[in-house]
Amino acid sequence: VDNGSGMCKAGFAGDDAPRAVFPSIVGRPRHQGVMVGMGQKDSYVGDEAQSKRGILTLKYPIEHGIITNWDDMEKIWHHTFYNELRVAPEEHPVLLTEAPLNPKANREKMTQIMFETFNSPAMYVAIQAVLSLYASGRTTGIVLDSGDGVSHTVPIYEGYALPH
């Protein structure tokens, strides 16, 4: 699961491309009762939130590559597992991505949610730029990662992002 400021990408190891790519947004109805008879939900995620944005208040739980709203991020992960990938997270090890300067407390919170909320059997958090470099068959190099909310230039040596 690649958590981006603008888009979330998710899929399975071994696949050539993500199975799901959708906006990293959570929307809630601006007014109660506006959507009467439409089976109104208390929140919408991704493409559904985008398509109903006219009557919703949209929130972006990832700002500049860093998760800032954990309740909404949990909704995005729930949507990823159950609606997009259609898997039981307790049956699959999970690989999550993070920004190069993601605070340690954030990584700990991601881990806690995966184990305690989604009962994931195993997980790993990897820096996005390192995974991009791996995809090119290299372990040492420099990656320019230009995303929707933040861009990073990341020097990587033998698989480790160098702080600079």
From Swiss-Prot:
**Function comment:** Actins are highly conserved proteins that are involved in various types of cell motility and are ubiquitously expressed in all eukaryotic cells.
Q: What is the originating organism of this protein?
A: Spodoptera littoralis
Q: What is its EC number?
A: 3.6.4.-
Q: Which PANTHER family match?
A: ACTIN
Entry PTM: Oxidation of Met-35 to form methionine sulfoxide promotes actin filament depolymerization. Methionine sulfoxide is produced stereospecifically, but it is not known whether the (S)-S-oxide or the (R)-S-oxide is produced.
GO MF: ATP binding; hydrolase activity
Specify the protein name.
Actin
Keyword vocabulary terms for this entry: ATP-binding, Cytoplasm, Cytoskeleton, Hydrolase, Nucleotide-binding, Oxidation
- To which protein family does this belong? Belongs to the actin family.
Q: What is the lineage of its organism?
A: Eukaryota, Metazoa, Ecdysozoa, Arthropoda, Hexapoda
Pfam families for this protein: Actin
What general EC class does the enzyme of this chain belong to?
A: hydrolase
Organism's domain of life? Eukaryota
Reactions listed under catalytic activity: ATP + H2O = ADP + phosphate + H(+)
Q: Which residues carry this modification: Methionine sulfoxide?
A: M35, M38
Q: What is its main location?
A: cytoplasm
Mind naming one GO cellular-component term on file for this protein? cytoskeleton
Where in or outside the cell it occurs: the entry states: Cytoplasm, Cytoskeleton
